[in-house]
Amino acid sequence: MYLRRVLLPTIVLSLSCPFSGAAAEFYVSTGGDDSQVGTAAEPFVTISRAQRAVRELKARGTLTVPVTVNIMPGTYPMASPLVFTPADSGTEACPVTYRRRGDGPVVLSGGRRLTGFARTDALWTLSIDAVKAGDWTFNQLYVNGRRRPRARTPNEGSYFRVNSALPEGKGGRRGFRYGKGHVREWENLEEVVFVVLASWYNTVHHVKELDAANRTVRFTNRAGRPFSWYEGHLRYYVENVAEGLDQPGEWFLDRASGVLSYFPLPGETLEDVEIVAPVVSQTLVRLQGEPGEGRYVEHVRFEGLQMRHTDAHLPKDLYDARQAATVQDAGLLADGARHCVFTDCEVANMGEHGIWFRDDCHHNLVERCHVHDLGGGGIYVGEKWRWGNNCPGWPGYKDLESIPHVTEHNTVDNCFVHNGCHLFTGSIGIWVGQAAHTTVSHNEICDMSYSGVSVGWDWSGNSSTSHHNTIERNHIHHIGHRKMNDMAGIYTLGVSPGTVLRNNHIHDVQAYQSPKGYCLGAGIYLDQSSAEITIQDNVCHDVSNAGFFIHHGANNRVLNNVFAEIEANGRIGWGMYFTSRLGKADRGNVAVGNIVHVPSGKAAKATQEKGKHGDGEAYDFVTIDRNVYWSSEKAMLTFSQSHGDEPEHMHGLNGWQRSGHDGESVTADPLFADPAKRDFSLGPGSPARKLGIRSIDTSAAGLYGDSAWVDLPKSTRYRAHDQV
């Protein structure tokens, strides 16, 4: 014991000497003990104890050497979040690093492994005393490293339909009438969860009152919009229902009895299964600076770690109708973080989002991280809504440059984000909101139910703190699953000067195709007031509705892109579609040097909408020229134009040119290198070259590095489309 008392001071004294090449090291091992001194021979057993040792080291004086906490392979259970404050900071010269040391994974787990299951017919069952006593519950379950769905009706991919909203009329947000046989007076009615899908978001509800005779259900929380909105009869399913436990992979927790029931998948055995239930809700690792006090978590690095097993927060008053699910939190959540790094980490089995650098975060880096199996989205950068006049959310400030605490100069590079949106279906692969100078590059994003990348985040049309963001060389594909609508491979919102979307490869975007409401799945989508954005050298193909769509906006430049094999379904289904508002100055848009390759022949549309912004006179809001149009099915190419209440005018190219568009454009086979194999580079003799259109090489989009990392997406199993 005497040796243990003196070793740490000896280490610390040596660290106070500024000799060159020195480093402070602590060790953590599952076989360690927190009463030990944290050396390789006598490691700690918890990361929090090592964190305290770093603080003790700092308390003796300014760091003069880098500090490394070496974490040996194994699983480290956590009953509460690991919180880093300004007291845990390093410096530029002496960062503090928490890293994996040795072969094998290091897992920071917010869950508890469950053992002792018994076979009961086709199910495995386990009685959990803490659940029966009311001390623990969970709404997520992870088996052999993958999330399993809670028992639901109807089963995954299918839905019931709302009959009518309650209360009746436009304000029906508290409940609805349901169809015969869809809902029952289940024994655990207070624990049942209704999940309702609208266009771009979903809401989660607990039951307040059920009237089986009149087939009505009322909820403890209201929906963000009426249940009659969008398509009149929204889709929904009911989760955590014992009677819904009817197919392999599902599970049900009876809180009254404390019994967990699991329907195993074929091939799963009790002898080698790992079943983990989360103890920690929402956030596992927290970087908690104090921006208002000018104190930040700085120069802390995390290398080679896995963070797993959190729950979702589903209170009875949950309000979660925000676009992009920005009400939810993340497994790794940062406020007031600067110069922090997550590299070569895996973030998985999260109840909500994966990673979020939120308020006042500067110069942080997320690189080569594998973020997957998520209740929500992947990686979020920036802040929630900032409404206001000119300076959104910051009243009293006269110019954007003086607004405090803006998130800026952050980078998300070379990350693989996939298999998300399991609970909060309107979440994003990588989201950038009210942030500036963000770089999102070389990421692969797939198997998400909503948009791949979103950037901007203001509806007002005023200046915002979102500007100079770069979205480049990302590979975004197999998203939507025909589950969510009003989405895109890349989606923007609001005025974003200096923002560039370039050299991205986007394909297999499949939006929900409503039988009554509008349908929009786009390759690239500039929504509400998007302005001052450059869209250049992107390739978008195999998209359900529009290759490119702009919904009001000004001074956007769409240059040298390929929009190919666009299905062009529905009224918004066109190769390129431009809208503006009469009475609103949505001017200065340019679409030049693009190739539109549409099987249906629906090439381009420009419309000025009459609406709440006033009628006004028609005006030129977009310059469209020097483009190449072609139908791979040799269909007649059509172009459409409309102004306010005027009837839609359909043209061939000649009529379209007489209306003032595409004067130097052509209809011709662009002679792609191999469109059947989705190679849309330009082959020899392409007529596009005569118009100054350059061939686009998509090979650099997505991940880079060693073959094991670059090939990792090849093992991804994409979810099936919803059956609606």
Residue ranges and their predicted role:
Residues 27-348, 387-404, 645-668, 676-723:
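Extracellular polysaccharide-degrading/modifying enzymes targeting complex plant/algal/animal polysaccharides
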Residues 21-24:
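Boundary at the C-terminal end of the N-terminal hydrophobic targeting segment
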Residues 81, 312-334, 348, 352-362, ...:
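Glycine- and acidic/polar-rich repeat regions and solenoidal domains
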Residues 365:
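Core nucleic-acid recognition elements
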